[in-house]
Amino acid sequence: MNDLDSELMICYETMQNPETREKLALELSKEVASKERWKEIYDSKPLNNYEIGKTSYYLNRTSFSGKLVSAAWGYRPKRSLPPERWGERIIPCGKYLENTKLTNLDFAEIIRTEGKDVLLYVDPPYFLPPKHKHYRCGFDFRRSY
């Protein structure tokens, strides 16, 4: 699995590792989904990959439409899975990721990679959005390949 968004891929790596996956599920189960906590985490500066993964997961689950760029508070108590149940998603997802190669590369490198028994599903890259409203990593269509 590949994405140019390094924070997203660090989040997946955090879930992929059995030790950090368990820690992530446990710590997030004790979190509070509030606008104040969201703002505190949004403004934080994670110090290591584990903290980046944890922050990314929290913000994805509590931001409007899961957006992490120009994010806005979007958690809805009756519609959003509460933090105490996030482990129900983290644990199985991480187990699926255990045998998955995770990369943080430009898509042009990925599609040129040869391999046996490789499945490529290429989600078209997004054009550079105005002011990076939705995605951290846009696509410069003028770039030559």
Each predicted region: which residue ranges?
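Short alpha-helix immediately C-terminal to the canonical SAM-binding loop
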Residues: M9
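SAM-dependent methyltransferase catalytic-core segment centered on the flexible catalytic loop
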Residues: F127-Y145
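Conserved SAM-binding loop
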Residues: Y12
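SAM-dependent nucleic-acid methyltransferase catalytic core
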Residues: N2, S6, M15-K133
